[in-house]
C-alpha cells in the first residue's frame, strides 16, 4: 500500500513539474517592432522572473563584403524589406574556433567557422524596457574575442532596462 502511494505521489509530482516547465518558456512566441521603413518580427528567447527577453536577429547594416565587394568600404543596403523575419541568428564573422566555441557549440578547436556575410546587428530588449513609454538608453557592444571566440548573437549581457545592440 505504501509503495503504491509513493508511486502515485511521484507521478503527480512529475506531471506538475512538466506542466510548470512547459508554460515557463515558449521559444516559438514572436514579437514585432516597427521602424520608419520596416517591421521586424523577432522572437522571445527566455523568460526570467516573468520578464521576457525579446530578440531581433540579423538586421543588416551593410551589403555583405563578398565577391567584388571584398576589401572595399561597406556599401549601403538600399531600401530594406518592408517586413523582415528577425528570428534566426545570423552568420558569425570568420574566425578560428576556440575552447569556448568547442565547449558551448561543439566546434573543434582551430576549426575555421563563420562566413564573410556577417554584417548584421542583433537587438535584445527586456519586456519591461519594451513596454516603457520613454526613450531608453541603447548599449552598443562590439564583441571582443581576438577573432577566436564570440559573436554578435551572444545573449549573456542582456538583462537590463535598456536596448542592447550587438555587432
Regions found by a protein language model. Give the residues of each.
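Bacterial N-terminal signal peptides that target proteins for export
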Residues: 1-9
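Glycine-centered signal
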Residues: 2, 15, 88-91
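Bacterial N-terminal signal peptides
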Residues: 9-17
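Non-catalytic accessory segments of hydrolases
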Residues: 22-167
Amino acid at each position: 500500500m505504501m509503495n503504491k502511494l509513493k508511486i502515485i505521489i511521484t507521478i503527480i509530482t512529475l506531471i506538475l513539474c512538466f506542466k510548470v516547465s512547459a508554460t515557463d518558456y515558449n521559444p516559438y512566441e514572436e514579437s514585432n517592432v516597427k521602424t520608419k521603413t520596416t517591421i521586424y518580427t523577432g522572437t522571445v528567447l527566455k523568460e526570467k522572473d516573468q520578464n521576457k527577453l525579446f530578440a531581433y536577429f540579423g538586421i543588416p547594416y551593410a551589403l555583405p563584403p563578398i565577391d567584388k565587394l571584398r576589401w572595399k568600404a561597406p556599401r549601403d543596403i538600399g531600401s530594406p524589406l518592408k517586413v523582415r523575419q528577425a528570428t534566426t541568428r545570423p552568420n558569425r564573422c570568420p574566425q578560428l574556433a576556440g575552447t569556448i566555441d568547442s565547449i558551448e557549440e561543439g566546434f573543434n578547436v582551430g576549426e575555421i567557422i563563420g562566413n564573410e556575410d556577417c554584417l548584421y546587428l542583433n537587438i535584445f530588449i527586456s519586456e519591461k524596457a519594451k513596454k516603457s513609454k520613454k526613450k531608453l538608453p541603447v548599449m552598443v557592444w562590439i564583441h571582443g574575442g581576438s577573432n577566436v571566440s564570440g559573436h554578435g548573437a551572444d545573449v549573456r549581457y542582456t538583462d537590463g532596462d535598456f536596448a542592447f545592440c550587438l555587432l
